């Protein structure tokens, strides 16, 4: 991996934002419909704000979160030993998801399925990071964190993702608690109401966390076989490419 500096990471993010701004604008506009932002038909016209977008989205989310989850590896003509191995794999995957949900619950977040259902319906994309992580005591835990596609940035290579980054805002006290770093240096007088942009960056080997100005976590091997991020648009519509830009927000230029 290249030894990325905060400036290089932010440059990648800014360039990708420029390329995908129509998509992110659409995501934000869809969320406004869900929040029932008041509709203004213009001067001289009566306006009515329908709750249909919110009701419809909530119905889809409820279907997705209440459906029975099935993890199945087909037996086929496998012998008894292979069938038992497949059963163990199914139980392992179910246990991984359960462990991931428990970690999210401790962090006061909805479960994996709940978050992904919401993002799928409201953003039209799914995204997240999945890793097995060792803590300071050497214990391994499951870390599955859904990401909001609105704040997810990525680059593609020959075999898929070449890098991915999740941009969030955190307070100085949160940064201190998570990474044990004083933003602005020791004794810096920063109001804890100040939100600081934090970039959680992954490539196929390393993970780096930084702000606009400093590294919070230096390049660390994440142990994955590639970029440990899952990401994609919802549905079966391929990323088609029009001869000219259509403005319909469904061509490759808008993704």
What is the meaning of each model-derived region?
Residues 209-255:
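Extended, charged amphipathic alpha-helical segments
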């Amino acid at each position: 991996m290249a030894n990325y500096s905060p400036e290089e990471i932010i440059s990648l993010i800014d360039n990708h934002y420029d390329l995908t701004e129509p998509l992110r604008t659409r995501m934000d506009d869809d969320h406004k419909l869900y929040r029932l932002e008041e509709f203004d038909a213009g001067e001289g016209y009566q306006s009515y704000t329908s709750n249909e977008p919110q009701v419809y989205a909530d119905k889809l989310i409820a279907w997705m979160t209440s459906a029975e989850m099935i993890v199945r590896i087909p037996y086929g003509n496998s012998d008894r030993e292979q069938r038992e191995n497949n059963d163990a794999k199914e139980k392992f995957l179910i246990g991984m998801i359960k462990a991931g949900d428990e970690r999210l619950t401790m962090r006061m977040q909805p479960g994996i399925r709940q978050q992904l259902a919401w993002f799928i319906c409201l953003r039209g994309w799914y995204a997240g990071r999945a890793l097995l992580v060792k803590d300071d005591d050497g214990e391994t835990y499951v870390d599955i964190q859904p990401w909001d596609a609105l704040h997810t940035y990525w680059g593609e290579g020959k075999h898929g993702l070449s890098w991915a980054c999740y941009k969030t805002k955190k307070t100085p006290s949160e940064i201190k608690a998570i990474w044990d770093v004083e933003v602005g240096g020791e004794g810096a007088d920063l109001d804890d109401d100040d939100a600081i942009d934090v970039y959680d960056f992954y490539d196929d080997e390393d993970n780096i966390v930084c702000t606009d100005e400093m590294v919070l976590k230096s390049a660390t091997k994440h142990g994955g076989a590639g970029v440990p991020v899952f990401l994609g648009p919802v549905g079966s519509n391929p990323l088609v490419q029009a001869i000219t830009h259509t403005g319909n927000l469904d061509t490759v230029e808008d993704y």
